[in-house]
From Swiss-Prot:
PANTHER family: ATP SYNTHASE SUBUNIT A. It comes from Brassica tournefortii (Wild turnip). It comes from the Eukaryota. The gene is ATP6. It is a multi-pass membrane protein. Keywords: ATP synthesis, CF(0), Hydrogen ion transport, Ion transport, Membrane, Mitochondrion, Mitochondrion inner membrane, Transmembrane, Transmembrane helix, Transport. Signal peptide: none annotated. F-type ATPases have 2 components, CF(1) - the catalytic core - and CF(0) - the membrane proton channel. CF(1) has five subunits: alpha(3), beta(3), gamma(1), delta(1), epsilon(1). CF(0) has three main subunits: a, b and c. It is found in: Mitochondrion inner membrane. This is ATP synthase subunit a. GO terms for cellular component: mitochondrial inner membrane; proton-transporting ATP synthase complex. GO terms for molecular function: proton-transporting ATP synthase activity, rotational mechanism.
Amino acid sequence: GFAWTMLCMNEIFYFIGALGPLFIVLALTGLELGVAILQAYVFTILICIYLNDAINLH
C-alpha cells in the first residue's frame, strides 16, 4: 500500500527495503544455528556428567 509506494519512490530506500528482509532471515538463521550448537554442547556435557556418575559409583 502506501508505505511500499513511499519506499519505492526513493531508490536508496528501495534498495534497503529489498535487502532488509534477506538480512533479517540470515540473522535469524544464524541465531538459530547458534542456539542449536549451544544445545548440542550442553547435551554433550550433561551426557558426560551422567556417564561419569554411572561408571564411577561413589
